[in-house]
Amino acid sequence: MNVEVAKARIGDVPAVVALVGRYARRGEVLPRPPENVYETLREWVVAKQDGELIGCGSLVILWADLAEIRSLVVVPEVQGVGVGRQIVCGLLAEAGRLEVPHVFALTRKPGFFAKLGFDRVARESLPRKIWKDCMHCTKFTGCDEVAVIRAVSSTAASMMGRAIADVCVR
């Protein structure tokens, strides 16, 4: 499978909105309206096969020491073949380039993230996320997502024994 993972462009926005919307309608991710994707376009990475969008995700910087992977989705037809891994690796590389030491995600698929060097943590250990976003979510008191985090900076990653190259070699 020949998949290209790259930073999103203006022309990708309608497909990103449609794909994320597909999963949002099922309650798997939060919706991202077009204006939100346009405003945050530089945060997005897309995966394409033969020019067609097959997956996407975004990296949101929350503070100097922390970023979040959001809206990670892959079309069902190519799930399980490494597209999600490639998107996450692209987002981790961007976090590394920006020198953000840690990246987290809230997910219903912690096993996927564990294979990429993420560890489970209590949501309460992410107070910036809780106060900024979670407090306003309709699922706040009954959240079914698991918080996972991993070190990105070479120093932090080596302390955890998980360099990005160890999990992102293609």
What are these regions (language model features)?
Residues 74, 80-95, 105:
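Conserved acetyl-CoA-binding loop-helix of GNAT-fold acetyltransferases
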Residues 36-49, 68, 141-144:
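A short helix-loop-beta-strand connector motif used in the catalytic cores of GNAT acetyltransferases and
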Residues 3-4, 97-103:
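Short active-site oxyanion
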Residues 101, 107-135:
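Conserved active-site alpha-helix within GNAT-family acetyltransferase domains
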Residues 46, 52-61, 65-73:
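Conserved beta-strand in the GNAT
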Residues 1-31, 46-48, 145-147, 154-170:
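Short amphipathic alpha-helix that is part of the acyltransferase structural core
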Residues 131-145:
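Cysteine-cluster motifs in flexible loop/terminal segments that predominantly coordinate metals
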Residues 23-24, 120-123, 139:
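Short, hinge-like loop/turn segments at secondary-structure boundaries
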